[in-house]
Amino acid sequence: MTLKASEGEGGGGMRTALSDLYLEHLLQKHNRPEPVSPQLSAVMEDMYTNGPAALGSPAQTQGQEARKVRLIQFEKVTEEPMGITLKLNEKQSCTVARILHGGMVHRQGSLHVGDEILEINGTNVTNHSVDQLQKAMKETKGMISLKVIPNQQNRLPALQMFMRAQFDYDPRKDNLIPCKEAGLKFLTGDVIQIINKDDSNWWQGRVEGSSQESAGLIPSPELQEWRVASGAHSAPSEAPSCSPFGKKKKYKDKYLAKHSAIFDQLDVVSYEEVVRLPAFKRKTLVLIGASGVGRSHIKSALLSQNPDKFAYPAPYTTRPARKSEEDGKEYHFISTEEMTRSISANEFLEFGSYQGNMFGTKFETVHQIHKQDKVAILDIEPQTLKIVRTAELSPFIVFIAPTDQGTQTDTLQQLQKDSEAIRSQYAHYFDLSLVNNSVEETLKTLQETFDQACRSPQWVPVSWVY
């Protein structure tokens, strides 16, 4: 049976309800006092200079403006990295390239991106190699003294953005990242709080719910999409090195991802912006899996065991009704002309043909189930996930994988291969993945997880709210 996904309808039905829920959540959160983050103490003293020989003089010399120089002192009491990367600017001056959120320097709050470093513990950074300075910084214990020229540009407020990862990432295997040790490992489905995205290629973030407080580097959406589309093996642009004093690198590849239509054609995925909502009921349960994995059995069991909770939208078909079939029960029987008109009007969520007859599921039949305060069960093809994943249908998507136990027959191996193909392409849509070793256990886990999701705060696509 060849199925096609309909263009569908707008998400206006649920959008208002979820928008109101989100607004109420924000108001409640805003009225609560924010926790105070602990900071390390740092001593700062401002001086003025128009050159190295005039440190401490507040005056200006003829034709020159005095530059504000800040003396920063703080104590390094552990082996913890300082959490900064530096680079040489166009004047070959050493400047702060990035500050890792939650790291030592971020917590004591005295350095900022763009600050120019003049001295470290009384040693002028000019005329010293990067290796020498890096070694000195690493071996320094106790009090650290820095003379810096603060960056005068306006500092942006902290971000409040969360993204759901749509791919697995391990910085240890990434040849593009400027510092593997500073990278953040995550898996598909992890929610990442974005801390900083000043660098167009490397954002800073941390996995929500993780015990790790400090942020790590992650590829920006543009970089990840460029990487996937081009099969990149080299970095697309300059990036600060991992050492505290990074050397400039030049790369051959020119990064033009933002202006390329190739990503629309390839459907490249990276991250999805999400928001956290208070508990609300998911209105649709979607079962995804390869043909023969047991979705129909699971669907039938859910319907028979919970008739007051779940319902299945009867498909429409142009096939003639059999004697034992009642119109509107197993199927809605309509003419080919009616089916064609409804398809043209985008009334079908999914439609296709089988043995010369047309079949399809209408949005309206799903809505009717929702109006009865029941959960609609859909067992659709993976390509339809984009259509159903809206605030209007508010789906909970479950991927059913074949058993990994027992004898590996040719049929089972093919089923596992088909299943893996679906998983690799659509895993970023799944709310739950289950291996169907036992129908009873699968049903139990599915229902428990679904019920728990409806009772708990949930991360949903930002498009469901705005």
Curated annotation (Swiss-Prot):
Where on the tree of life does the source sit, at the highest rank? Eukaryota
- Biological function: Essential regulator of neutrophil polarity. Regulates neutrophil polarization by regulating AKT1 phosphorylation through a mechanism that is independent of PIK3CG activity.
In terms of SMART domains, this protein maps to: GuKc, PDZ, SH3
- Protein name, please? 55 kDa erythrocyte membrane protein
Q: Which residues carry this modification: Phosphoserine?
A: S19, S57, S110, S243
Locate the region Interaction with PALS1: 268-466
What's its membrane topology? Lipid-anchor
Positions carrying Phosphothreonine are T49
Q: How is it modified after translation?
A: Palmitoylated.
Q: What are the alphabetically sorted keywords of the record? A: Acetylation, Cell membrane, Cell projection, Lipoprotein, Membrane, Palmitate, Phosphoprotein, SH3 domain
Gene this chain is encoded by: MPP1
Which is an annotated GO molecular function term of this record?
signaling receptor binding
Q: Which InterPro entries match?
A: GK/Ca_channel_bsu (IPR008145), Guanylate_kin-like_dom (IPR008144), Guanylate_kinase_CS (IPR020590), MAGUK (IPR050716), MPP1_SH3 (IPR035475), P-loop_NTPase (IPR027417), PDZ (IPR001478), PDZ_sf (IPR036034)
What range(s) does the PDZ domain occupy? 71-152
What GO CC annotations are associated with the protein? cell-cell junction; plasma membrane; stereocilium
Guanylate kinase-like domain ranges (all copies): 282-451
How the protein assembles, per its UniProt entry?
Answer: Heterodimer with PALS1. Interacts with DLG5 and NF2. Interacts (via guanylate kinase-like domain) with WHRN (via third PDZ domain). Interacts with PALS1.
Belongs to which family? Belongs to the MAGUK family.
* Pfam families (UniProt xref): Guanylate_kin, PDZ, SH3_1
Q: Which residues carry this modification: N-acetylthreonine?
A: T2
Domain named SH3 is located at: 158-228
What species does this protein belong to? Bos taurus (Bovine)
In Gene Ontology terms, what is a biological process of this protein?
regulation of neutrophil chemotaxis
Its taxonomic path starts at:
Eukaryota, Metazoa, Chordata, Craniata, Vertebrata
Q: Does the keyword Acetylation apply?
A: yes
Q: Where in the cell is it found?
A: Cell membrane; Cell projection, Stereocilium
